[in-house]
Amino acid sequence: DLAKRKEEALAPGTDRARQRQHDRGKLLARERIDLLLDPGSFHELDLLARRPSDSGYEDRPYTDGVVCGWGTVDGRKVFVFSQDFTVFGGALGEVFAAKIHKLMDLALKVGAPIIGLNDGAGARIQEGVVSLDSYGGIFYRNVQASGVVPQISVIMGPCAGGAVYSPAMTDFVFMVEDTSYMFITVPDVVKTVTGEEVTQQELGGAIAHAAKSGVCHFTSADDASCLEDVRYLLSFLPSNNLEEPPVVPTDDPVDRLCPELRDIIPPSSNQPYDMAKVIEAVVDDGEYYEYAQRWAPNVVCAFARLGGHVVGIVGNQPMHLAGVLDIESSEKAARFVRTCDAFNIPLISFVDVPGFLPGVDQEHGGIIRHGAKLLYAFCEATVPRIQV
């Protein structure tokens, strides 16, 4: 009987629901976990969890719509939950949330990253206020884990209503282009209230949040490449705030010269140049991973390595607005600096900035307040800081 239950729990949705997921270009919850983690490393928690028999609900599938457990990425332990859109549309209910609460508590005790693969329809309205209350437990744990263990949210389908706030409180947000979206209110409600007609992708798609709102830090073409990108990001991060980031052996000499900088940086301060090329010339093997590349492009934030050690780089980008600091770039850089400081990543600043952007919109939008965030972040940081 136990073997039969486990077999049922491993494929709780219908064949039709699973096929529809694939037809939309999306992977199933367990397929995503298999791609994210090292082969054979996944250990599942609460496989047979479901609604209690006296709950009054006839539909009581195992897992309750979310797959939870731990495994390894490049041999390092991580905790992961993957919402299953084939069960209740991935909507959050009481048991669903309890599994995530347990997972987050364990990750915090162990000191390992938390990765959420989001693909769900928000709160399970059939369960009423109980499901809404369950969000509070997730939000609370997001805050308790902030700056203690890395938290990564991967949006791989719908994420609407209250469900959007947990990813917003995590350290990094990935989105899959064309198949994922985040918004508080759906387009139909927006049209009813404001009269604005907008599609799901225009309102809350990956490109919209990567380029306009700044909610999304990394975008990918499909599920598989997105999960590979998550693995790559983890290679720059420690497991928790008491550890150092991974050191990677390199053949790039630490004492090499960079004569190409003479050609990249023009003699006149009035001529623009690409700061990304400067970073590429300096870091190990020319390899770096840019943070929030599409948003506030007048400042470049990136993870890279020098001598095999991870560093966080903040550089003004003369190719965009002459590298001037405005509201969005100040907020972007401040968040990046504070994240690096939390996880013991030294900071290097490549400075070429004419100052803060003047203008009525900037002043009324709070450039003083937002600019102060960047100053605060640098002054607060206790990691080594180098200005170039």
Q: What are these regions, as identified by a protein language model?
A:
Residues D1-V388:
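Ligand-binding clefts of soluble mixed alpha/beta catalytic domains
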